[in-house]
Amino acid sequence: VAVVLGVGLACLRQAVFQALESAGPRVGVGLRVLVKPNLLTARPLACAAPEVTAAACAWLLERGARVEVADSPGFGRADAVARKIGLEAALRPLKLRVRGLDRPVPVRLPLPEAPEGRGARFMVARRALECDLILSVPRVKAHSQMLLTLAVKNCFGCVSGLRKALVHTCEGRDPDYFADCLAALWAALPPVAALADGVRAMHVTGPSRGRPFALGLIGASPSAVALDEALCAVLGLEPGRTPLGAALERRKAEGCATAGWRAEYPLLRPGDFDARGFELPRELAHTSFHPAR
């Protein structure tokens, strides 16, 4: 089930609570939840708004969850990015702080078309593997390599630190193969729910140097895959047109319409939003990791 909610900048907390109450994950007392923002860089629009992440944490805490907020940027420290964008201050009243996704362990990721016993091998943060639920909190952004970066792509931050740069360098030249690796990583993690910040999206290029686009939505779902498909619908894009969407369809991932899932929209529907003018990259960059992009 996915929900998309129209929202203005002045009522983010209310919008986040409404979205999560309508179509958020089931949360019980003591559930260990890793809230995973995308702390890529402190550049404008690169991360979800601090108020969105903090509101999600407040909603989880009110339901008795044990909440941690963590990420692992490819370069630099998560807490440093959080401080610069105001997330550290936004979390302080909740007595939460941003941690790094370190202590990596090797995880072998079987790929659909690879020979049996072969596949990718990622070094994944132990904290991400040991929680009960991950709540992915991305901003809706164009991406020069993956076309879009949404909730499932945000899971790549569970690969520790500079190891992401190594993966990009080794696998990033082929977007389809890299997308298969990302889909396999999502499948290896605990259940991934999602809350997407699309109030001010990023378009034209990304994930860090695109232009702002007033999309005006917050999206939530217990399934990161289902939310990504709903956001593609908002943008008038078939999920399979993105490398990662196609990889998830090949895997018949739970949450894909092609696997038999049908989204229900208890609030607004994708057609209620006007995404005309949202520009995607004209061609994908078949290149290795470049921190300035």
Predicted regions mapped to residue ranges:
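N-terminal and secondary-structure boundary signal
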Residues: V1-R293
